[in-house]
Amino acid sequence: MRISSLLFLTFLAGIVQAQDFLAMFKPFLGGGGGGGNPFANPQAIGGLFQQFAGGNGGGFGQLLAGAMAPKPAPAAAGPRSAPAPTNEDYNTDIDVPAPKAKARAAPTPRRAQADAPPVYRQPRTKAEKIERFRNIARTFSPFVYEVNTTPAPHFDNFIWQQNAPAVTPEPFTFAPFSFPTLATVAPPAPGPGGPTLEPFLPTTASPKLLAHNTARMIREIASFSDGGRSRDQDFGAVQTLMQAFFEAVSSGNNGGAGAAAGAGTALGDAPMLQAHRDGTELGANRALTNKLFESDMVLTVKQMKAIVLAAQEARNPHGRKKRKVITGSVYRWKSVIPFRFKGGDAKWKKLIREGLGLWEKETCVRWSENGPGKDYVIFFRGSGCYSSVGRTGGSQLISIGYGCEDKGIVAHEVGHSLGFWHEQSRPDRDDYIHLRKDWIIKGTDGNFEKRSWEEIEDMGVPYDVGSVMHYGSNAFTKDWDQITIETKDSRYQGTIGQRQKLSFIDVKQVNRLYCNSVCPVALPCMHGGYPDPNNCAVCKCPDGLGGKLCGRAAKGTDHDKCGGELTATAEWQEMVYKGKRTCNWKVKSPSGGRVRLVLTELRYQCAPACKAYIEIKHNTDFQQTGFRVCCFNKTYDVISDQSEALILSNANIVDYEVSYKLQWIQDNGKALPPPKPTSTWVPGKENRPFRGVENSGGTIEKFILQAIPKIRDSHRPLESITSIVAEYGLATLLGISHNGK
């Protein structure tokens, strides 16, 4: 007891001697509002804190009001933008460089005097101590509090506004403390500046955090792209032009079933904009809808102005035309393209190199990691999948973020950096696809605008629904069960949006733009082939064709076991395949007539954009991708436009066996015959080409069975029983039904 009293007296003495002790707690005590006696109402802990809060002149109310005051309002979209939030606001592993602050000049040290007293660290002032304690309190304060709703900051979800209305917070009130459950702060209501967007990863984040996600993308663009750092050229100016463009071309989607199903929906509706893995970059970028042009293109002010002017010229056909200002040779790289990594782990970097390797394998374009040059590309793991278009000067970016981890998506974004736009923006797209505008998200119509022939360079190649640069079927859809792009020929629906490989036309465009002078000697290549810039002695052939001049079927993974040349005759022929190989078949009619193909059976994994598939090329131009089938719901009956047709079976990327049955004949008007006995070639297993199908028996089996003596004599019971048993056993062995049919 005496020890306790002694400790208590020592504590009181320390209080008297501490000159700054009461000053440190002065902000917690009641001020002009009347203060509060901490022991006046000791019935509850919550009451104790309420008394500490005091009146309007001081207490925890004033302290927490400062700690929880609304952050600065976002800045308006315009040519200049305020810095976006720092990296700590986001779940990322990259290091986005912050804008460099102006360095302060270090004070010149004074020369020490011989008789000068030693210099010690100056003690903190009262104000510094108070501020330090406030910072600690903001971090560790356990109080439960409720926010009096005040007008939310004015923001439009993609850039901070500079002239936001001032918001004066009302005093905070406190609810009784309830241990251990802590209440959460109510998020601010969406401001009138625009709808909110759902973040890339599905969460229940507040609109303020969603605005941060988009602001982070703008910070990335400003940090990694030199093209947007000059005055009136930053991405804020681009977005101002882009939003005006979207509003000008928006159709409103006011009619049709899609409009009725989507009544009341808006661009910012959260469920509609959550990320969706559809195998394309558009699915991963849903949260950035209308913040990037056509979902994944970072344009310069010059490029965006050209698009706006072209849209105006399209509505005024008598005006002056702008030519080739946004793509093609205007933004072509000069030689080897330097690139650098910013952050990322080894697996992510390997994926980038594989995507670049797809282009290097098929073209003369080469990429140099950390190579020299003032113009270069920075790969980083950003807010989504997006890229600059063409060479824009200085450093430019390609973001391969979470959800974009596919080498086909990498190849797509690299295609943009080489100077190419989306395939469906070509002027001739209406000959191949149809837009279902009723199902397009309202306000995103501008992402489907066609370019004019004056704006683009098609490099003399036809439209290709199988291009790696083509939108998928569900681009900008308000309902994932409904497609927005429908192919005119329904058989090609499973072809668009593929990200498995570069198409022949993708490669040919790049080679014509970058490699046209590599091979000085022309070759008489067939079917649209051309000298291969990686080997000028042979032709670069369309998919499915090979040989020096593209005159025969290309070799598959096992050319000796599947693939080759087939001849169509006046009689039906049939092929049944089962395995996991890539095979290429060329079917030709020797008399110059057309070829009829019938696909009667198919076993592949069904997908919106086929990964493993049967591809049939039956048109006159073998450069274009054929129609790909992986979802079998009907028999495909095709007649070729010429005397040849190609069948490509792609199954080497799957871990299961695929199978299909194909019949062909020289087209002469004959009806498809009933199924005949066929030979099923199963690589690596026993093959019996004489076996019948469906237990009906073939010619050889029936001949063997009929050659057995049939004894049915009641006077010879032993021989009769032996004959019946032998006939039954042999029929079972040969796969023939026991009724003899």
Swiss-Prot record:
Function per UniProt: Metalloprotease.
GO molecular function: metalloendopeptidase activity; zinc ion binding
Residues listed as glycosylation sites in the UniProt record: 633
Name of the protein in question: Zinc metalloproteinase nas-30
Residues reported to bind Zn(2+): 412, 416, 422
Encoding gene (name): nas-30
Skewed-composition ranges (Low complexity): 71-85, 97-118
Pfam families with a match to the protein in the record: Astacin
Naturally occurring in which organism (per UniProt): Caenorhabditis elegans
